[in-house]
Amino acid sequence: MHTPIASKGTSGPSRRVEPGMTSPAIVYTRTGDSSVLEPKDREVTEPAAGEVRVRVVVSGVNPTDWKNRTGSGPGEKLAFDEVVPNQDGAGVIDAVGPEVEGLAVGDRVWVYLAQHQRPTGTAQKFTNLPASRVVALPDGVSFDVGASLGVPAMTAHRALTVSEDGPSRLHPGALEGKSVLVAGGAGAVGHAAIQLARWAGATVVTTVSGPEKGALATAAGAHHVVNYKTGDAAADIRELVPGGIDLVVEVAPAQNAALNAAVGANRASVAVYANNGGDTITLDVRPNMVLNTRYQFVLLYTVGDEALRNAEADVSAAAAAGVLDVGEATGLPLHRFPLSETAAAHDAVENGTVGKVLIDVSSE
């Protein structure tokens, strides 16, 4: 059950729309490359019971968005007649449906999983979505940060809380005395994992492919950065953390399985959230058995309500503390697109643009 949150908006009636009122959106009606994305003026509707309507200010783009759009091949039948893409966003509540508590018109919010098992994501000016996927944006936290919290930060939170010994929640001191290896620290999830792990008190090591990405990981807060292309990454990590790594946040398990076994501490956990580099992992049984290594796969769509609620609360607390800031200065360059160029935004993410891709949907 969604925990009600404090509201600073008005508790009066929702704003009604005139019949036939429309707003700009991007839709697709078949799977395929970014050319299937088309502009459309969609009717603005009242939120149903348990829903709110959000005026989206910024929409965040993640790899899952273009992968959902692509499907397993072009021309697949969709579950809905048309789909508005993008899971994450931030904006202002414009209307509140019946049976919603703790949210009100005028509240600044961040949203996540907006398009999961639903046809309407955040690539549109107004979106109706379950109140359970809407979270108060803390005072002083920008819409850019809010639109960057969902998939990246909540995935990172889950990855950092799957160890056998816990913790299940993150806060200052929660990972005190632990060592965390973040594979690919210049990506959006890696960036959030570095920030959250350091906030929680861990010693944070990250692997990168070059000095530019290394500088970004350092700006995010990594204590140690290892360039895996220029030396012996396992030896370098072992020198930095002689006791071994307690928890790996893993983006490329097929490529890094041997490295993880070489640097893991006893009873290390490897949290796998992506399949960069291949879908099949080959594990050397003996070293992993000796370490009692634990592999835990992470997918936000199926982690369960308790994990989502925990992530909501802890990610919001971290954002309020200034921990999850975005932009070049904090290691995550922003790449902005207008709503009309959503296809280009999807292409940027699909092509591996370093940083966070955001779509400006409406004014603040």
PLM feature spans:
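Glycine-rich beta-strand-centered segment in the early N-terminal region that forms part
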Residues: 43-61, 72-115
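Short glycine/proline-centered loop/turn elements that form peptide/ligand docking sites
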Residues: 98-99, 206-216, 229-233, 254-257, ...
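Mid-domain Rossmann-like dinucleotide-binding core that forms the NAD(H)/NADP(H) cofactor-binding site
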Residues: 147-230
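Glycine-rich phosphate-binding loop and adjacent beta-alpha segment
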Residues: 255-324, 361-364
